[in-house]
């Protein structure tokens, strides 16, 4: 009887497993295929060089290089979010195809250890590997690899100097692409060995068109004014704008995305709060000013964010003379430096707002 029960249990378990496996098989055949969630920044990253927006000169040169399969060492520099990394990744995919892309490309960014030891070992070992000149699909493939050093301006001078010799020795089998925001932080011997390309800041129109296209594909309810506001607070960084758009969409849960939602997502200080600071400064009351600053800190707003937004508000203020603007701007620079050095936020903001109050009351 016990054996019989065991047998029944086993057979029942087998039947249960079989039954459970049936819908999984049906799902794997394509009827109910589950799509993996992907960040929109990666989902809408350019897949080929021609999809790169607003960088016509760079695209034209790369297109000629891809046609001849003759790629020089590259140096991409420009503001963040303008497509530097996306451009070289798209070019590498076109050169090597999806099957060889992982084998032929080594990508290192600021999150990786990139001291002199890494340049001497990891980069050098990868560069010394020999590769064939053909792909599995029969298409021609250049006989070299690509090393992408993202945020190269954060590398030490010693690591950059070590990289110089590696670039020379492995020129037959490896091409290097250095990506940075500030080209002045790259040593001259490296820049002289690379073809330099400056990535221009994306215009507001280009960014708005791209965001509207993504919003349409993702069925996001958002108006043109909200898109324009999103572009403004992103400060020319399209990557940041796309991330804010996705976060705002998830927060609203399918409802229309408003400016207030975008403000909360982006960590921007509301315009009403900035106006409240100016109102307190105009009043000439130090007690009112202290209450406003204390409330600002209690709400969790970043002091550096306030400095940036106050700077824009001061520059656009038509009631202030150029002399008063210059005094306040100089104070903004001092406060920004002190905050970067770890000074107390409350004291620095009080000092800044006191200067603004002094200039506003003198101007009246």
From Swiss-Prot:
Keywords: Acetylation, ATP-binding, DNA replication, Nucleotide-binding, Nucleus
Highest taxon in the source lineage: Eukaryota
A GO MF term: single-stranded DNA helicase activity
Protein residues bound to ATP: 78-85
Modification N6-acetyllysine occurs at: 6, 13
GO biological process, one term: DNA-templated DNA replication
Record's GO cellular component terms: Ctf18 RFC-like complex; DNA replication factor C complex; Elg1 RFC-like complex; nucleoplasm
Keyword Nucleus: yes
SUPFAM superfamilies on file: P-loop containing nucleoside triphosphate hydrolases, post-AAA+ oligomerization domain-like
Record SMART domains: AAA
Subcellular compartments: Nucleus
Xref: PANTHER family: REPLICATION FACTOR C / DNA POLYMERASE III GAMMA-TAU SUBUNIT (PTHR11669), REPLICATION FACTOR C SUBUNIT 4 (PTHR11669:SF20)
Family: Belongs to the activator 1 small subunits family.
NCBIfam families, per database record: PRK00440.1 (NF001679)
Name this protein carries in UniProt: Replication factor C subunit 4
Source organism per UniProt: Mus musculus (Mouse)
Lineage: Eukaryota, Metazoa, Chordata, Craniata, Vertebrata
